[in-house]
């Protein structure tokens, strides 16, 4: 059977394929335009960031730039300057995707030379197409975005403004970007640096920074989280719970209601470590130290011993228990056997080093006195007259001493008759056991 409509089917198929190819070509163009637009938008954001950094730089250095510019001669700001001063991050590239380099030209306003105005201009590299310039001029968010089409004039987005590059001492070429920073914009930037913002401004930490001293007029700073400072001077009291200091704390006096903890030494150059209420010094690790609980004695905490390789010296030294020495007992003063002493029980030595003890009020040697065996001993008898007597005044001596091993504990005198020499002295001698 013959097919009379076969040609129509082929024609329909070809038409459908043609439409698909046209749609693909159209879609590819739309996609390409979309990609380009996104790229230009990205470039516009980069220009906006650069311009914002330049605006901040001008605001902070307003007075300096006034001195280095005129109405016709600009002060030029480069990417390197913005990076070195921290207004741009160190990773910001010197050129954009087309190799163009941004610079800001700052001049004085011709009508009011005390005010500054600026133009951000790109130069060098590959020119942008007009379509890209128009798109980017509209997308720039800092300042008034524009572009350069004739190499001499900067034109604003939607042709909203037009300024000759020569007014700013700038040079560029066709297909480049321009951004106008008006006197109002830069005056606002200068004022930004003079204000202390109550809230954080993203990307603008300088707005929360003081650049001079602040006088609170005797008013308070309340609800402060932390105070970080190099030094502090207080004419009144400083009250707090805890304090940590990495350096020195100096003052005329200090009062603490609770504790003071130091990681190193506590020194007094010309004063005392004064405590009250039966307190003193305590070593927490070992539980020892010194304190006073009355007006007479310095006491050892927990009855700890006192150890030194040097001397312990005092008017008197008393031991309620035994007195020990790891070497010898050295007695520096000497006593004389038989001499009086007090109280009984003292221990001494004579000049030869022999030990003496105080017994019954007399220094005696190591042997005890046998008082039950004491006897009177008298001097020898000499029948002679005293001085002025019958024998013509001769003088005679009658010595008396105790036998060896005895000690004299008393004396008595004996005499008879006028002029008769029967006077003598008796000695009361007691033997040692």
UniProtKB/Swiss-Prot annotation:
Residues 362-433 are annotated as: Variable region. Disulfide bonds: none annotated. It comes from the Bacteria. Keywords: Plasmid. Residues 1-361 are annotated as: Constant region. The keyword Iron does not apply. The keyword Phosphoprotein does not apply. Pfam families: Shufflon_N (PF04917). This protein is expressed by a shufflon (= clustered inversion region that works as a biological switch). The orfs of this region share a constant N-terminus, while the C-terminus is variable. This is Shufflon protein C'. It comes from Escherichia coli.
